[in-house]
């Protein structure tokens, strides 16, 4: 699905490289760590995803990260959670859809041809390791304390980057 969506988006953004990074094992390790509050898992997943994305961005000589997030779509997309997630990286994070209405985003996805692909059933790792009650208003201090319980976090990031696949 992702490869098909990237092909469509490449029509609008020029040269595109897709970096596929294995992340399921990292999520599994976080979810199995009993010292980490379950409600903070999603924010921690996103912080590690952003750290990995930042390393790829530096490697690619990019100046920032761009996401398709919109406020309030899912638990991780609240202002407090986005602030806690963004704090994990040093480069700017751009969210061009942040203030758009969900119906407008869906309509635009139909216009450019990504909607039907996005709507196909797919088991993503986020849903596999989703806590019952994810935090919707994370406090940065609590997130950083929970993250300190992830002793091997840097090695997980490095291992994921070593296994990345680049699709042009």
Give residue ranges: language-model regions.
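ATP-dependent adenylation/nucleotidyltransferase module used to activate substrates
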Residues: 1-111
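Peripheral terminal appendages
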Residues: 16, 62, 82-91, 112-168
């Amino acid at each position: 699905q992702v490869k098909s969506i990237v092909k469509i988006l490449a029509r609008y953004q020029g040269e595109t490289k897709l970096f596929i990074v294995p992340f399921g094992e990292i999520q599994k390790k976080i979810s199995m760590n009993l010292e980490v509050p379950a409600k903070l898992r999603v924010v921690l997943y996103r912080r590690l995803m952003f750290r990995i994305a930042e390393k790829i961005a530096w490697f690619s000589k990019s100046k920032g990260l761009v996401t398709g997030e919109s406020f309030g779509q899912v638990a991780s997309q609240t202002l407090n959670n986005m602030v806690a997630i963004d704090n994990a990286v040093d480069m700017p994070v751009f969210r061009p859809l942040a203030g758009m209405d969900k119906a407008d985003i869906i309509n635009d996805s139909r216009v450019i041809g990504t909607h039907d692909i996005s709507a196909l059933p797919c088991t993503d790792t986020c849903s596999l390791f989703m806590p019952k009650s994810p935090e919707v208003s994370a406090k940065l201090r609590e997130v950083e304390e929970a993250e300190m319980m992830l002793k091997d976090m840097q090695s997980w990031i490095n291992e994921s980057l070593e296994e990345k696949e680049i699709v042009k």
